[in-house]
Amino acid sequence: LAKINLGLDVLGRRENGYHDVRMVMQTIYLYDEVKLTKKKEPGIELTTNLGFLPTGDTNIAYKAAKLLIEEFGISEGVKIVLNKHIPVAAGLAGGSSDAAAVLFGMNRMFGLHLQQKDLMERGVKLGADVPYCIMRGTVLAEGIGEELSVLPAMPKCTVLIAKPPVSVSTKVVYEALDSEEIIEHPDIDALIEGLRQKDLHRISENMGNVLEDVTIPMHPVIEELKQVMRENGAIGAMMSGSGPTVFGLFENRAAAREAQRKIRESGLTKQVYVTNVHN
């Protein structure tokens, strides 16, 4: 399952280059399909429906399988069939959710009896978003993104996702961000209070992402997508993660469908999806 960031604040940069963050993350019902099958012969075989994706040990789903095979001395091999629906390199944690699915599936398939916290401890070795993709739901992430706390569940609403045809490097965006020059930090506490009150309007008013100040000047189409969503009934619209994906929150599914149609007609992007929050 994909994730969006309802709030993303950067508090500072550590000496090792990692950034201290405070983020509110939410799972949405947009998913990849991951099928695992045991093989008698050892080794990992990964296939995917997208020809440009790596299928070897640079693929995070492959790395997840390799991690468990090596740690537990699994003699059999595994075949992974990855059917991608979540846009790639979009700020939606698609790769991280695939890795989480492989950890879940292999835990069950090989009877490893790992609990959720055990899977999360292994997930963080693969990527900062993997533990969250194991946990799912409405979650506060702190530290470098590895300290997770469950929040009151996001109220039901329709989510419109639009991925423009541009690529964004998370590394480049964070490197360009000088935390001392962040003029306005999002009010994460007010956002959390909106979640407690199950008030979609208060949540939307307090959404914020400091990385927009870096990514939008690189790709103005992000601001254009936000504008189209707001003009067509979105209560709030924001870039997710380091971008370039934009999401809008709607109370009315019909309005979200109309905004989807307008975005496609505008030529801004063809990758537009109507979905829901998933708790």
Which residues fall in each region the model found?
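Hydrophobic packing within well-folded, soluble alpha/beta domains
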Residues: 34, 61, 80, 102, ...
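Glycine/serine-rich anion-binding loops at beta->alpha junctions
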Residues: 81-110, 128, 235-250
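ATP-dependent small-molecule kinase catalytic core of the GHMP/sugar-kinase superfamily
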Residues: 7-23, 109-236, 249-279
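A generic structural signal for well-ordered coil/turn residues at beta-strand boundaries
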Residues: 2, 30, 134-135, 155-158, ...
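Residues embedded in well-ordered beta-strands within globular domains across many folds
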Residues: 35, 79-81, 238, 273-276
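ATP-binding N-lobe of GHMP and related small-molecule kinases
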Residues: 1-90, 108, 112-120, 154, ...
